[in-house]
Amino acid sequence: AHSYNPQAADMAYALDPFNMTWVDGGRYAILGPSGCGKTTMLNIMSGIVQPSEGKLLFDGVDVTTLSTSERNIAQVFQFPVIYGTMSVEQNLAFPLVCRNYEKSVIDAKVQEVAEALSLQGLLKKSASRLTADQKQLISLGRGLVRDDVAAVLMDEPLTVIDPDLKFRLRRQLKEINQKYRSTLIYVTHDQNEAMTFAENIIVMDAGKIVQVGSPAELFDRPKTTFVGYFIGAPAMNFFECQAAGGHKLSIGSAEIMAGTDLSKVGSAPLKLGIRSEYIRIVEAKGANTFTAQVQRVEDMGNYKLVTAVFEGHVIKVKVERDIAVPADRVELQLPAENCCVYAADILVS
């Protein structure tokens, strides 16, 4: 945990107390809105910030009070940090030169990293003359060139990168992770970056870790309504509802069978959540169906996005382009296995 003013009578946490284990060689993303504590967490790992409470362990060894240089951590910041008076080759070699590696070892390692990052043709160029994405690759390469780096921490590293290049760079990062088995921890507020890069995502809000899981877990079973809103485009559909006994609930006049036992939810306000990808357009009434009024149908390129209304509830439905959508009314079905029920905004398991 960390507070920037731990002596205050009304002390507020920038990072609430938590326990978490990071697996060596893993590929992680820390995802959340601005100011939620992402960078504070990253800076505690690297040693830039010392936590006001708790310990940081590497392989069981307490490193909480160690300096950044003693932790063998590489950190890539939002804006590229390079040595403009040096060539690309000299930039990549610099961490090894500082540790008095033999020249033959330095040359071999620089060539290996340059090949992994597609920088071979730029090694003799001045680093100051490169594009923003090339400079950021140099920053990353300086972290990878050392064999003793325990983890590479990246704080929104693609902010300055042209959108067309971001996908390619994320792919390169994944290839580097697979080749070197370096632990990569990537901070971002962009869900698309997190979902396409990470094996596991840590979702944060207001200094708290609200869910840790794979992209599929976060998408299919968000543990809070916040995660449901934050992950996905469009966000998860949510309907205020009431328990109707057993696994049944009611959304207005519609009766829905959910895959969750609701007998112990008590008096907490309930919401049903379901992704737009899982709602079906059907031809006839049946289990878990209701009739909604079509507001608009948008062609999104590789799919259609239907916006419909049922008794005041706005519903987003993704359908394949070749599916015909009625102009006025549509019968919608909510499959029970895809329904998530939330009591006081927390997933009922």
Residue map of PLM features:
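Conserved beta-strand
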Residues: A1, M11-V23, G54
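The feature captures the beta-strand-to-loop junction immediately N-terminal to the Walker
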Residues: L31-P33
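ABC ATPase nucleotide-binding domains
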Residues: N72, I82-K223
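Conserved ABC transporter NBD signature motif
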Residues: G54-D62
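Short beta-strand immediately N-terminal to the Walker A/P-loop
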Residues: Y28-A29, Q75
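Helix-to-loop junction immediately C-terminal to a conserved catalytic motif
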Residues: S46
